[in-house]
Amino acid sequence: MRHKIKGRKLNVTSSHRQAMLANMVVALVTHEQIKTTLPKAKELRPYIETLITKAKKADLTVRRSVLSKIKDKKAVEKLINILGTRYKDRPGGYTRIIKAGFRYGDLAPIAYIEFVDRDINAKGNIQQDANEEIKN
């Protein structure tokens, strides 16, 4: 019985799952929007939300704690300096998940996960990306 067991397995080992989530956090912090499968996006959301909540405090212990979760120093700097100050007055709900149909080949549900009030120049506009995919 799977009672009271949190999280999704995502059909990988625990070390693979931790590394995958850390890499997805780095990509999300860098580009402020990523395209992934829906279960991965749903698993990533609470992970990044806790990191941003910690980053709002912005002291040395927080920096070390976040650096132990994700190993990219540039991503940690952006998380604490830019995103932490951007969401300082917001009590939560820093990300949104937008469903984007199904992947061709295996019909896996695809979703965009992005920051609320994100910098559009960091990655691009979802509507433009969708229009380009339809044209191709």
From Swiss-Prot:
The entry's keywords: Ribonucleoprotein, Ribosomal protein
InterPro entries to which the protein is assigned, alphabetical: Ribosomal_bL17, Ribosomal_bL17_CS, Ribosomal_bL17_sf
HAMAP family recorded: Ribosomal_bL17 (MF_01368)
UniProt cross-references to PROSITE patterns, sorted A to Z: RIBOSOMAL_L17
UniProt record, GO biological process: translation
Quaternary organization: Part of the 50S ribosomal subunit. Contacts protein L32.
Family listed: Belongs to the bacterial ribosomal protein bL17 family.
SUPFAM superfamilies in the cross-refs: Prokaryotic ribosomal protein L17
Gene Ontology MF term list: structural constituent of ribosome
Protein name, per record: Large ribosomal subunit protein bL17
Cellular component aspect of the GO annotation: cytosolic large ribosomal subunit
